[in-house]
Regions:
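Residue-level detector of the transmembrane beta-barrel scaffold of outer-membrane proteins
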Residues: 184, 260-262, 278, 288-292, ...
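Outer-membrane beta-barrel channels and translocator barrels
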Residues: 258, 284-286, 315-317, 349, ...
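Periplasmic polypeptide-binding modules associated with outer-membrane biogenesis and secretion
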Residues: 2, 19-46, 51-297, 301-309, ...
């Protein structure tokens, strides 16, 4: 009843305030309330309407016009020109007989009109199959094939002016890539309206082979020119290539010190066979200080943090990029979306990170980097209770690596060496509020991961922040070893594929698939089989009841279990969360069991009656992972900056090496909204776990194998996610 009353009050307030904020209707002209195009079948009506000046007035929340947005005024002269634009739009796509047969202006009321348009598209003019190319005889076979196949105009399809112009440009670029900087491509189109067909021919003048002339760089002030030239890799006298110029521009942008880069080739003197190059840059501020903050509210924790960051992009000269960031925060424990209650403890956490990058390291296109960090954080779960003693970790880490771009900055190779340490401690020392001491368990160990990492990324997306088309393929390979005091030995491999396709203007279908494999050699004994795990658990229970029975730690079952659990916590795979399976909280998908190194207050999780209870079960991590997702992203009528999405996610994590289960999909579906900002979309997702499509243990009501995440607000099997950036 209280929630219903609150909802009614909210709607009433919106209705009242909308009247206060709504602009008065103009008296000079009627307002266009809607524009409708009928008869459009070969193209989307919205695509045609987006080209017109006559447009419907935007509506706040899709309901009220004149609230926060200006009205669109109706003008008969503008509408007349728009009718010509519609016919020209169709002509450019091969529909030469298209006509606007009706344009009705309907008076809605004394202030508003609705515009209804009707178009008859007619039959298209089809491109004949014999598209001719003349003039390629004078170039080499490989160059001729590249120019010949560059034509994007397709025989048997409607004659498209954009494809025709793009074909000429593509042929010119193919020749320019091979050194023919002065190449010219002309075309001729003979249209027979009666037969609805068109003959197309291209005429090529390759011109002489060219070389780069003098290379001038304009606009430098603080940025050292020698580093710019090393990244540019364009030298006077070398063979000309248009693709190399485009790659050079991307390399300069990747330096991160320019707001704009423009590279111009001077082709005004073909007889000289020299092409002077002008590089005009606009330097960005090289030093910056940033202050801010953020909040986190999900099924694992509620927290707030501050952010302070400083960077210098020419530290000590040579374009060295030094950045330092501090992020102190506080967790309101145990408040979270599945446990709405007042906190009884404040847990202080934080991290400090620094990174130094050196462009043109070893050679012009390679960047060297050195990063260090220190983090302090509690070990929290979506099942944690207000009476749980808590442990946390101090995590120092370091990384040294290289990054090199290939294939016009589409392929990135990143080898690095990494060192991470997880040092456990009693988190009562960093808590304010209720004091719950936990005696440090002798089973707690320091876990140190020392490993080389080879990451390869092939990025074919049209945009890295808001992709609409393309794909991203990546793979990471790690080999943990005993160097630098490492305590884990394993091999970890994780490939991933992401794809994007714009099915209609603004409507993007996105997909993601990944697998992960972990091959441990000095841990994970307890995950070999359920029988072996049960044997160790039983032995541990006996040892707990008779502490003097086995004084040798090497033979201690409890110690072996605890070491397995802590190493898997660092190196194992988990699934669930805003960038994973969104129907589950962080680490919500995968094997669960009572962790022998964690205390549960008054509950003895080693006892048979508690071992498989929700009070004791926690995610342990697994050796095999798979995740898939499909998502439809689309615009909303509220604002261009506000977009929406619907998605389906599935994933699983198993204990075994290369072990897959066909009956454990952990299927979730949901919806979300994204508010676009310059630094990426602010994303809110609601993920719902589909009953009967999870894992055998969950679906049957027995959660021993896979855990059973708490209900959202104690009501529904779902999770709320708030994050910055798309899920993928």
């Amino acid at each position: 009843m209280g929630r219903s009353r609150s909802f009614i009050v909210l709607i009433s307030l919106l209705l009242l305030t909308s009247g206060c904020l709504r602009q008065a209707y103009p008296t000079t002209a009627p307002v266009t309330s809607d524009v409708e195009l009928q008869g459009a079948t070969v193209v989307s009506p919205s695509e045609v309407l987006s080209k017109l000046s006559t447009a419907k007035s935007p509506r706040f929340l899709g309901i009220w016009d004149g609230v926060l947005f200006d009205y669109e005024l109706f003008d008969e002269a503008v509408l007349a020109r728009d009718l010509e634009r519609i016919e020209r739009f169709y002509h450019a796509r091969g529909y030469y007989e298209a006509k606007v047969t009706a344009a009705r202006v309907i008076r809605v009321d004394e202030h508003r009109v609705r515009v209804e348009l009707r178009v008859v598209e007619g039959a298209p003019v089809i491109t004949r199959g014999d598209i001719q190319r003349f003039g390629l005889e004078s170039v080499s076979f490989d160059v001729g094939i590249a120019a010949y196949t560059a034509v994007t105009l397709r025989p048997g399809e409607p004659l498209d002016e954009d494809a025709y112009e793009a074909s000429k440009q593509a042929m010119t670029s193919a020749l320019a890539d091979a050194g023919y900087a002065f190449a010219k491509v002309n075309g001729r189109v003979d249209v027979d309206i009666a037969k609805h067909e068109a003959k197309v021919a291209f005429f090529v003048q390759p011109g002489p082979l060219a070389r780069y002339g003098k290379v001038d760089i304009v606009g430098l002030s603080e940025v050292p020119e020698n580093k710019v030239r090393q990244a540019l890799q364009i030298t006077e006298g070398e063979a000309y290539s248009e693709s190399n110029l485009q790659d050079a521009r991307r390399a300069l942008i990747a330096l991160g010190v320019f707001n704009g880069v423009k590279i111009t080739a001077d082709r005004s003197d073909p007889e000289s066979r020299q092409v002077p190059i002008s590089v005009v840059v606009e330097e960005a501020p090289l030093r910056s200080l940033k202050l801010g903050g953020g909040v986190r509210l999900d099924a694992q924790q509620t927290s707030a943090h501050l952010v302070g960051a400083w960077e210098h992009k020419n530290f000590l000269g040579g374009l060295r990029h030094l950045s330092v960031e501090a992020r102190p925060g506080v967790v309101l424990f145990p408040t979270r979306t599945n446990n709405i209650e007042s906190p009884n403890r404040l847990l202080f956490e934080g991290q400090l990170r620094s990174q130094l990058k050196q462009p043109a390291f070893l050679e012009g296109r390679t960047t060297g980097s050195l990063a260090t960090g220190l983090a302090v954080f509690p070990l929290l779960y979506s099942e944690s209770t207000r009476d749980d003693p808590l442990i946390g970790f101090v995590r120092p880490d370091a990384k040294v690596g290289l990054e090199r771009a290939f294939l016009d900055h589409h392929l990135y190779l990143t080898p690095s060496y990494n060192w991470q340490a997880y040092l456990p401690f009693d988190y009562d020392a960093l808590s304010v509020g209720r004091s719950i001491d936990v005696e440090r368990d002798s089973r707690l160990i320091d876990v140190i991961a020392s490993f080389p990492d080879l990451s390869v990324r092939l990025d074919l997306r049209d945009n890295t922040v808001q992709p609409k088309d393309g794909a991203l393929i990546s793979v990471s390979w790690q080999l943990a070893n005993a160097l630098l005091s490492g305590t884990v030995n394993d091999m970890r491999v994780r490939p991933e594929l992401r794809g994007f396709y714009e099915i209609a203007p603004g409507w993007v279908l996105a997909g993601r698939a990944t697998v992960g494999f972990l091959f441990p050699s000095n841990y994970a004994e307890s995950t070999e089989s359920s029988n072996r795990e049960q044997q160790l658990l039983d032995e541990c229970q006996i040892e707990t009841a008779n502490p003097a029975a086995d004084p040798d730690p090497a033979l201690n079952a409890c110690q072996r279990l605890a070491e397995d659990e802590q190493k898997l916590l660092v190196r194992g795979f988990f699934s669930g969360g805003p960038e994973s399976n969104r129907g589950y909280p962080y680490r919500g998908v995968g094997p669960h069991r009572a962790l022998s190194f964690l205390s549960r207050g008054n509950v003895d999780c080693t006892a048979d009656q508690y071992r498989d209870s929700r009070a004791c079960l926690r995610p342990i991590g697994g050796l095999t992972l798979w995740e898939t997702s499909i998502e439809l992203r689309f615009p909303t009528p509220v604002s261009e900056s506000l977009r929406a999405a619907i998605f389906v996610d599935a994933s699983d994590v198993t204990r075994g090496v290369v072990e897959f289960r066909s009956n454990a999909l952990h299927l979730s579906t949901g919806f979300g909204v994204r508010y676009l900002t310059p630094i990426g979309p602010i994303r809110f997702d609601f993920g719902f776990r589909i009953p009967g499509s999870q894992a055998p243990g969950i679906d049957s009501g027995n959660s021993q194998a896979d855990g059973d995440p708490p209900l959202l607000f104690g009501l529904i099997p779902a999770t709320l996610n708030l994050a910055l950036g798309e899920a993928y």
